[in-house]
Curated annotation (Swiss-Prot):
Basic and acidic residues: compositionally biased ranges: 221-254
GO CC annotation terms, alphabetical: endoplasmic reticulum
Domain EF-1-gamma C-terminal positions: 276-437
InterPro entries for this protein: EF-GSTs (IPR050802), EF1B_G_C (IPR001662), EF1B_G_C_sf (IPR036433), Glutathione-S-Trfase_C-like (IPR010987), Glutathione-S-Trfase_C_sf (IPR036282), Glutathione_S-Trfase (IPR040079), Glutathione_S-Trfase_N (IPR004045), GST_C (IPR004046)
Top-rank taxon: Eukaryota
One Pfam match: EF1G
Gene: Eef1g
Protein name per its UniProtKB record: Elongation factor 1-gamma
Length: 437
């Protein structure tokens, strides 16, 4: 089973393909998408990154065994299982057919139509109208194919469904309003069936379909464009004027700034996004440096080094401890699927890593398991309400604030951080644990 790290930027629909595939196959995929671990536009241009991934593109996957692969479809294929890839030569060929169709037929018109509504690309009326007609053709083609089928290939979800759904995602979210999509009931049924599968929801969350077709906003587009400073012209000195014309031209040529590197569509999307406000900016400075504890936890012995460091430096006024327990243990069946619930939550909380740490454990066996963990948050309240992006999963858990000075808390922190102990409050053996750091 594949295991490794996926480098990407936040909310990259191309990365969703591999992450959803991993939900089905059970592949263990860690995501690095935000500083300090990964800074898109910088990290992926470093010599170290380019040695592994010469194209400098993301998503890029580095296996725990050192195997490296880029291109989203290749990564999704690698982390999949036989069922997703197509269990017969004929099914496998059809999966490749739809994956190729998504890239060649869906991406171009979808980008032409959707990107201007996001302020990423300038609007061209004729190009947009052509793209709309092309999208109609594609949805109609899918509608005919799905008239007698639940999924694109065979009777179960495959990479074909995962890839095409992810490619259509922004169309359904941004421009396919009810009056436009109603002509394609079979495509809509299939799309809704897929996005409501637990494995899709674990990565995509709740997908809200477009209610009103988004339009190009010229002001938003103008604001998204990088502003260039125009140097002020100054009168040249007498000596400057006396220089030979050819010499002055050479100096100007030498002083001319290097042309800006052309941004790809993903970088343009990031540049277009307004800088997010730090949800924790209102809190006073704390003496507890979470990153330093994380380094101790990752590189030193937990019981003899990391835990003593934690309690010695923990700032109970600037940080808080919480115990979380999954509300619906009766719904947990296969342990690998239960583990994927934890992984999916961690992935959606990626931007919270700088201000949180957690150890979450899956206890028990198939059809008899539970999930609980200990969390460390900046501030005295739960962090999830501070950002809509963090609110997908937390209501599925009960949360209890812990007293850092109590013996119970000391025991919980020791057992959950080390994955060792009696866990008397659980009544089940440790199956496996996950660390959010």
């Amino acid at each position: 089973m594949a295991a490794g790290t996926l480098y990407t930027y936040p909310e990259n629909w191309r990365a969703f393909k591999a992450l959803i595939a991993a939900q089905y196959s059970g592949a263990q995929v860690r995501v690095l998408s935000a500083p300090p671990h990964f800074h898109f536009g910088q990290t992926n241009r470093t010599p170290e990154f380019l040695r592994k991934f010469p194209a400098g593109k993301v998503p890029a996957f580095e296996g725990d065994d050192g195997f490296c692969v880029f291109e989203s479809n290749a990564i999704a294929y690698y982390v999949s299982n036989e069922e997703l890839r197509g269990s017969t030569p004929e099914a496998a060929a059809q999966v490749v057919q739809w994956v190729s169709f998504a890239d060649s037929d869906i991406v171009p018109p979808a980008s032409t139509w959707v990107f201007p509504t996001l302020g990423i690309m300038h609007h061209n009326k004729q190009a947009t109208e052509n793209a709309k007609e092309e999208v109609k053709r594609i949805l109609g083609l899918l509608d005919t194919h799905l008239k007698t089928r639940t999924f694109l290939v065979g009777e179960r979800v495959t990479l074909a469904d995962i890839t095409v759904v992810c490619t259509l995602l922004w169309l359904y979210k941004q421009v396919l309003e009810p009056s436009f999509r109603q002509a394609f009931p079979n495509t809509n049924r299939w799309f809704l069936t897929c996005i409501n599968q637990p494995q899709f929801r674990a990565i995509l969350g709740e997908v809200k379909l477009c209610e009103k077709m988004a339009q190009f906003d010229a002001k938003k587009f103008a604001e998204s464009q990088p502003k260039k400073d125009t140097p002020r012209k100054e009168k040249g000195s007498r000596e400057e004027k006396q220089k030979p014309q050819a010499e002055r031209k050479e100096e100007k040529k030498a002083a001319a700034p290097a042309p800006e590197e052309e941004m790809d569509e993903c970088e343009q999307a990031l540049a277009a996004e307004p800088k997010a406000k730090d949800p924790f900016a209102h809190l006073p400075k704390s003496t507890f440096v979470l990153d330093e504890f994380k380094r101790k936890y990752s590189n030193e012995d937990t019981l003899s080094v990391a835990l003593p460091y934690f309690w010695e430096h923990f700032d109970k006024d600037g940080w808080s401890l919480w115990y979380a327990e999954y509300r619906f243990p009766e719904e947990l069946t296969q342990t690998f699927m239960s583990c994927n619930l934890i992984t999916g939550m961690f992935q959606r909380l990626d931007k919270l890593r700088k201000n949180a740490f957690a150890s979450v454990i899956l206890f028990g066996t198939n059809n008899s398991s539970s999930i609980s963990g200990v969390w460390v948050f900046r501030g005295q309240e739960l962090a999830f309400p501070l950002s809509p992006d963090w609110q997908v999963d937390y209501e599925s858990y009960t949360w209890r604030k812990l007293d850092p000075g109590s013996e119970e808390t000391q025991t919980l922190v020791r057992e959950y951080f080390s994955w060792e102990g009696t866990f008397q409050h659980v009544g089940k053996a440790v199956n496996q644990g996950k660390i959010f750091k």
